[in-house]
Amino acid sequence: MAEIMHVFAREILDSRGNPTVEAEVFLDDGSHGVAGVPSGASTGVHEAHELRDGGDRYLGKGVLKAVENVNEEIGDELAGLEADDQRLIDEAMIKLDGTANKSRLGANAILGVSMAVAKAAADSAGLPLFRYIGGPNAHVLPVPMMNIINGGAHADSGVDVQEFMIAPIGAETFSEALRNGAEVYHALKSVIKEKGLSTGLGDEGGFAPSVGSTREALDLIVEAIEKAGFTPGKDIALALDVASSEFFKDGTYHFEGGQHSAAEMANVYAELVDAYPIVSIEDPLQEDDWEGYTNLTATIGDKVQIVGDDFFVTNPERLKEGIAKKAANSILVKVNQIGTLTETFDAVDMAHRAGYTSMMSHRSGETEDTTIADLAVALNCGQIKTGAPARSDRVAKYNQLLRIEQLLGDAGVYAGRSAFPRFQG
């Protein structure tokens, strides 16, 4: 296999106008890979460390230190290694960093190189990235979980829940699912305008109308689904990313004007699941409330997907504990939460072996990089969360999945309703 000849990084901008790292890897056979690193707005305290420069430049958010770490230490360490040994390369960078959370070199530096190496190796092998990573069994196209109303830390809409998503579970193909989702998105704009609300957009391309409650937002989406000619629960299901750690303060959940315990929040979710065709609830409780997650999973986990995002942070060790405690039943997969592809692979594999579902995910700060689209297929996630069908940083991932579907031809299978085995709607 071709060896790594040169590793290089630069500072670029993400979709929110903040700096991020872009890494390039060149192999001795002329092959090449480039990758841009995403960044989150609502971040879990257990995530790998994103290295920022501080100071006045870019309001302290520059990444020149991370870029320097790639161009000097990481590049020197990886020169001469075979590019197809992803685990060896990732472990070399982890060892070089020497910290538990990649804080010395920066997870943003390490991840950029990790992804660029995989792309260069795929280029050298003459394979698309999803096939290079996933092998011949990589053939399942994921359900697009489209965030069409943005709230919480992603918008100024006033609603506490961070994301209201649609899942086109009734489609036969990914391309049909994408069309269905886009049609609902446009119908929602019409519904919002008819009610005299703002059609401004949040970080992830979803609308950010000023609504008073979770139910009001869900009602808007149900109306849009029907306006577009689809049946809620049959053609299009609903999903939530609550991001509850964002409104957890002093031991209570400050939700919709009241203060609630974990048990009271569980009742809120149970009522929502009974009232709406909800297939998935992400981060319903604070990120260290293990007991609360276990109780919630026992209460409603048989009929809805309970996803750990800030709760698991794509970390195999936290996931292992969650499996042992029967806390949640699904993992959100964000490559920059853990910082290398290898550790991401390990987390997804562990989840699937335990009967957990997995959802590949973007971050609110994205680039035109499409790696996660390939990873969703390569790792057989069955679900992908990458924003509304709007804004090129989000649509780039959907368009890549259209290309993958075309490449797969008759071998491609759309996950559809099967991605949500617990949903009884």
From Swiss-Prot:
It is found in: Cytoplasm; Secreted; Cell surface. Pathway: Carbohydrate degradation; glycolysis; pyruvate from D-glyceraldehyde 3-phosphate: step 4/5. Mg(2+) binds at D241, E282, D309. InterPro entries: Enolase, Enolase-like_C_sf, Enolase-like_N, Enolase_C, Enolase_CS, Enolase_N. The keyword Membrane does not apply. Keywords: Cytoplasm, Glycolysis, Lyase, Magnesium, Metal-binding, Secreted. Its EC number is 4.2.1.11. Its cofactor is Mg(2+). It is an enzyme of class 4 (lyase). Catalyzes the reversible conversion of 2-phosphoglycerate (2-PG) into phosphoenolpyruvate (PEP). It is essential for the degradation of carbohydrates via glycolysis. Belongs to the enolase family. This is Enolase. It comes from Corynebacterium glutamicum (strain ATCC 13032 / DSM 20300 / JCM 1318 / BCRC 11384 / CCUG 27702 / LMG 3730 / NBRC 12168 / NCIMB 10025 / NRRL B-2784 / 534).
